[in-house]
Curated annotation (Swiss-Prot):
Residues binding ATP, per UniProt: K302
GO molecular function annotation: ATP binding; methionine-tRNA ligase activity
Subunit structure as annotated in this protein's UniProt entry: Monomer.
GO cellular component entries: cytoplasm
Signal sequence region: none
Physiological role: Is required not only for elongation of protein synthesis but also for the initiation of all mRNA translation through initiator tRNA(fMet) aminoacylation.
Lineage, uppermost ranks: Bacteria, Pseudomonadati, Pseudomonadota, Alphaproteobacteria, Hyphomicrobiales
Name of the molecule in the record: Methionine--tRNA ligase
Organism listed in the record: Mesorhizobium japonicum (strain LMG 29417 / CECT 9101 / MAFF 303099)
Subcellular location, record wording: Cytoplasm
C-alpha cells in the first residue's frame, strides 16, 4: 500500500550574508513538522535551499572582488552547514544556480507567456536594493536626513527600465475565490486577513524581469533580461518536485505545504498561486507564515547588527535545548522573543528538571533494585493505566495541532503528560514501596519507564538526539520508534536488559559572563 505523500518546504534563503537565528528557527520548525509526519507513516519530502541570484548577490560579489557564483558557492555551503547544525532532516537542498532550476524557470515562464499573461513594457518606481522590490511613492517616507525609505526601513532610489510584466491584475477575482473556498490556504488567520485585504485593494501587474543586472536566469528569447527574483526563487519548489517533467515519480509529491516568514507572505500567497494558475499547475496545499524572533524584544536584522549566530547558540546551550526552547516557547505563527534567561529557565524546568529527572530517577532505581532489567509488571491500578493513557491521548492532540502547524500546542500536550507523570511518581513513592511492597514498586517503576518510552517516542520530532538517547536507555529497537509504537501493544517487555542509566539533559549551570 502506498503511503500518503507529504511535501514540506522552507523558503530558500538568500546567501549574501551569514545565517542568523531567524533562518535557523525556520529550519528547526519545518524539520519538526517533517519529522512528525515521517514518524506518523507519511512519505515525506522536505526541501530547503538557497536563492542565489539577484542584484544584492552581484553587488556583494563585486565588493569582495569575486564572481557571484563563487559567492553563492561559498555562502550556500555555510547555509547548508547551518541546516545540518540545527538537526535538519531535509531530503534535498536546492540551489537556484543549478541547471535543472534554469530549465524549470524557463518552462514556467513559457507556460505563463503561452497563456497570454506576460508582456513587455517600461517600469519606473522607487526601488529598494535590499528588498529587491519596487514601491509606490505612497508606501515610502522621506526622512529628516533626506533619504526616502520603504516600510521596512531600507533606502529607495528612483529607477526606470524596460521590463516584462505578469498580468497579476487578471487574477484578483480568482485569488479571492481561492481564499474563500479554501480558508486554510493561508495561515495563521491574521496573515490570511492581511492577504485578502491586500488583494481586495486592487492588484497591479507585476514587473518580473530586470535589465539592470545580469546575475539571474535569462528570459527565454530575450537574453538582455533576467528573471526577477520572485519568479526565479518561487519556482524552486516545483524544480525540486521534478518540473517540468510532470510524469516523473518525484512530481507525485507536489503540491507542497510552504513554511515561510511573515515578511514574504505576499509573494507566496498572492504572486505564487497566480503564477501557478497561469501556468496550469496545481496550487500549494497551504502557505503558513511564522512570526519574527526578537532578541530581548528587538527584531533581528543583519543590518542592525544584533543577529545571534545559530552555531554559537547551539554550541553554548546544546542543540536540543535550542530546538526545544524555540518550538515550545514561541507560539508558531506569532512573534517571539528570546534571551539567555528565557532559554535557561525553560530548558532547565522542562528538560533537566522535568523529563530528564523523571527518566534518571526511575532508571536509576531500576538499575539498583531490579537487576538492570525492565521490571515485572504486576496488577495495574487505575492511576497506572491513567498516566499511560494520557500519553496516547497526547498523540491524538499533537496530531491535530501539527496538522495546523501548532507546534507549540503539540509540545504543550506532551509535556503536560511529563508534569502529570512527575506527580504520579512522587505520589506512588517507589523508594518507600521498596520496603513495604516490592512487587508494587516494580509495577510503578515499569509504568514510569513505559511512560518515558511513550513520551520519548513523541518527543522525537522536536528533540531528536535526546529522544533517541532516552529510547536507547530503554533498549527500544530502532524499528520500534514510530508513532504507531506508542500504543500498549509495543510496551516494554519485563526482563529486557537495560544499559546503565545516564543523564540525558544536563542542567544548565550559570557561568560568570555567560549571557548570550
Amino acid at each position: 500500500m502506498s503511503r500518503e505523500k507529504y511535501y514540506l518546504t522552507t523558503p530558500i534563503f538568500y546567501p549574501n550574508g551569514k545565517p542568523h537565528i531567524g533562518h535557523a528557527y525556520t529550519v528547526i520548525a519545518t524539520d519538526a513538522l517533517a519529522r512528525f509526519q515521517r514518524l506518523d507513516g507519511k512519505d515525506v519530502f522536505f526541501l530547503t535551499g538557497t536563492d542565489e541570484h539577484g542584484l544584492k548577490m552581484q553587488q556583494t560579489a563585486e565588493k569582495e572582488g569575486i564572481t557571484p557564483q563563487a559567492l553563492a558557492d561559498r555562502n550556500s555551503a555555510i547555509f547548508r552547514s547551518m541546516t545540518e547544525a540545527v538537526g535538519g532532516s531535509n531530503d534535498e537542498y536546492i540551489r537556484t544556480t543549478e541547471p535543472r532550476h534554469y530549465a524549470s524557470c524557463q518552462a514556467i515562464w513559457k507556460a505563463m507567456a503561452a497563456n497570454g499573461d506576460i508582456y513587455l513594457d517600461r517600469y519606473s518606481g522607487w526601488y529598494s536594493v535590499r528588498q529587491e522590490a519596487y514601491f509606490d511613492e505612497s508606501e515610502t517616507t522621506l526622512g529628516e536626513d533626506g533619504v526616502r525609505r520603504e516600510p521596512l526601513g531600507s533606502p529607495v532610489e528612483w529607477n526606470e527600465e524596460e521590463s516584462y510584466f505578469f498580468r497579476l491584475s487578471a487574477y484578483q477575482d480568482k485569488l479571492l475565490a481561492l481564499y474563500e473556498s479554501q480558508p486554510d490556504f493561508v495561515g495563521p488567520a491574521e496573515r490570511r486577513n492581511e492577504v485578502m485585504s491586500f488583494v481586495k485593494s486592487g492588484l497591479k501587474d507585476l514587473s518580473i524581469s530586470r535589465t539592470t543586472f545580469k546575475w539571474g536566469v535569462p528570459v527565454p528569447g530575450d537574453d538582455k533580461h533576467v528573471m526577477y527574483v520572485w519568479v526565479d526563487a518561487l519556482t524552486n519548489y516545483i524544480t525540486a518536485a521534478g518540473y517540468p517533467d510532470t510524469k516523473s515519480d518525484q512530481w507525485r509529491y507536489w503540491p507542497a505545504t510552504h513554511i515561510i516568514g511573515k515578511d514574504i507572505v505576499r509573494f507566496h500567497a498572492v504572486y505564487w498561486p497566480a503564477f501557478l494558475m497561469s501556468a496550469g499547475i496545481e496550487l500549494p496545499k497551504r502557505v503558513f507564515a511564522h512570526g519574527f524572533l526578537f532578541n530581548r524584544g528587538e527584531k533581528m536584522s543583519k543590518s542592525v547588527g544584533n543577529v545571534v549566530d545559530p552555531f554559537a547558540l547551539i554550541e553554548h546551550y546544546g542543540l536540543d535545548q535550542v530546538r526545544y526552547f524555540f518550538l515550545r516557547e514561541v507560539p508558531f505563527g506569532q512573534d517571539g522573543s528570546y534571551s539567555h534567561d528565557a532559554i535557561v529557565n525553560r530548558t532547565n524546568a522542562d528538560l533537566a528538571n522535568g523529563l530528564g529527572n523523571l527518566a534518571q530517577r526511575s532508571l536509576s532505581m531500576i538499575a539498583k533494585n531490579c537487576g538492570g532489567v525492565v521490571p515485572k509488571r504486576g496488577e495495574m491500578t487505575d492511576a497506572d493505566s491513567a498516566i499511560l493513557d494520557q500519553a496516547v491521548a497526547a498523540l491524538t492532540t499533537a496530531r491535530k495541532a501539527m496538522a495546523g502547524q501548532g507546534i507549540h500546542l503539540a509540545l504543550a500536550a506532551i509535556f503536560d503528560v511529563v508534569a502529570e507523570a512527575d506527580r504520579y511518581f512522587a505520589g506512588q513513592a517507589p523508594w518507600a514501596l521498596k520496603k513495604t511492597d516490592p512487587e508494587r514498586m516494580e509495577t510503578v517503576l515499569w509504568t514510569t519507564a513505559e511512560l518515558v518510552r511513550r513520551v520519548a517516542v513523541l518527543c522525537q520530532p522536536f528533540i531528536p538526539g535526546s529522544a533517541a538517547k532516552l529510547l536507547d536507555l530503554l533498549a527500544v529497537p530502532a524499528d520500534k520508534r514510530d508513532f504507531v509504537h506508542v500504543h500498549a501493544d509495543y510496551a516494554l517487555v519485563p526482563g529486557t536488559a537495560l544499559p546503565a542509566p545516564e543523564g540525558v539533559f544536563p542542567r544548565y549551570v550559570e557561568q560568570p559572563g555567560a549571557n548570550a
